[in-house]
Amino acid sequence: MRAYTKFYITPKGERAARSGHPWIYAEEITRTEGEYQNGDLVDVVTNKGKYLGTGFVNDHSKIRVRLISTNTNDKFDADFWERRLRYAIDYRRTVMPGADFKCCRLIFGEADHFPGLTVDRFNDILVAQTLSLGIEVRKELIFNLLYKILREQGEEIRGLYERNDVKIRLLEGMEENKGWFAFAEAAEPGEPLTEIVENGIRYNVDVENGQKTGFFLDQKYNRQAIAKIARGKHVLDCFTHTGAFALNAAAGGAAAVTAVDISAEAVQMTDANASKNGLDKVVKGLKANVFDLLSELVNNKSREYDFIILDPPAFTKSGSTVKNAIRGYKEINLKAMKLLPRGGYLATCSCSHFMKEELFVQMLHDAAADANVQLRQIEARQQSPDHPILWNVPETYYLKFYIFQVV
């Protein structure tokens, strides 16, 4: 006899659960049997009572239950979580070998069956973001197990910094906060600053104040891809953030790189990272609004750049704003295509799950038609494999990345 409260769901919810999707929405629940508290484990069953899975419940969330297992034999003790952590770490050691393992995403939420949990590694600091109550109430166990496993494997980890300063936690009935997590056995972690090496390039990372968890790891191999074709090019890197694409282009032999961001802090960090790597004679930061800058360059009929990189923030974070996002993506891509000479190169991407691949591709077709150019595709890429895409969970696929030659 199982001890968990039962949640009976609709046939629609049953179909989604059987297909492997871990989210049970509030409107899919028909009745419950037993008592529970938010954050508890509950069983999800069909309307006829057939077991579908076990997950975390939270009445504050539209996603009422987040499934973590479909195995009735699982016991959700420390051994269960340790097995799951080791599985995730072993996967990263396979797909992010050598030095890449010191700078990668260790846990990618639902794709690793840790719903609502992200853990990034930046050299000797782990950064975690917890967006589900079920993980929140178990994080002491999970984080200490993760620390133990990494230390056993010879990895030097001085602390875990929590970046829970995101409003989505409020929708889950949790508070916003950030700060060091107190491991059961660890020395004082010190300053929330570290240095990472990605693709042979060194960066300062501020895990306390940087965007999201401090540095965008999902473009690691896309940066390598643009470096291969940057030699001798005059590059315009738009929405540069910490200058990662700009620095990879410079390291690849670019003649000159202009790294643009609207944030003065981002431009300062880009310049500092360029100096750190001896690339400050090639990379120059520029504080500007990318939309305005591209318009100005088009109006001036500039032919200054023969390689343009567009890595904008997510223009849409919900299905209701996709149409506006398409207009924004089209505007910057159209202007970039107009600026590039025949034979020039364009790297462009979208990091929004809601901007579906087919929509992004159609937008690029429309922009190319309006610019009266043809696009020769060099590569179609996605997020790096430490951000794995679980086919049963389309929300885990979000980054679309293309490299074209304009012909």
Where do the model's predicted regions map?
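Non-catalytic substrate-recognition/targeting regions of SAM-dependent transferases
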Residues: G109-D120, E140-F215
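Conserved SAM-binding loop of SAM-dependent methyltransferases across substrates and taxa
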Residues: K228, T242-A255
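Mobile active-site "lid"/loop adjacent to the S-adenosyl-L-methionine
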Residues: Y305-K335
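Conserved SAM-binding motif I beta-strand of class I
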Residues: A256-D261
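S-adenosyl-L-methionine
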Residues: E265-I309
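Non-catalytic accessory regions of SAM-dependent methyltransferases
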Residues: M1-N123
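C-terminal catalytic and target-recognition region of SAM-dependent MTase-like enzymes
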Residues: E304, E331, Y345-V407
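Conserved class I S-adenosyl-L-methionine
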Residues: G232-H241
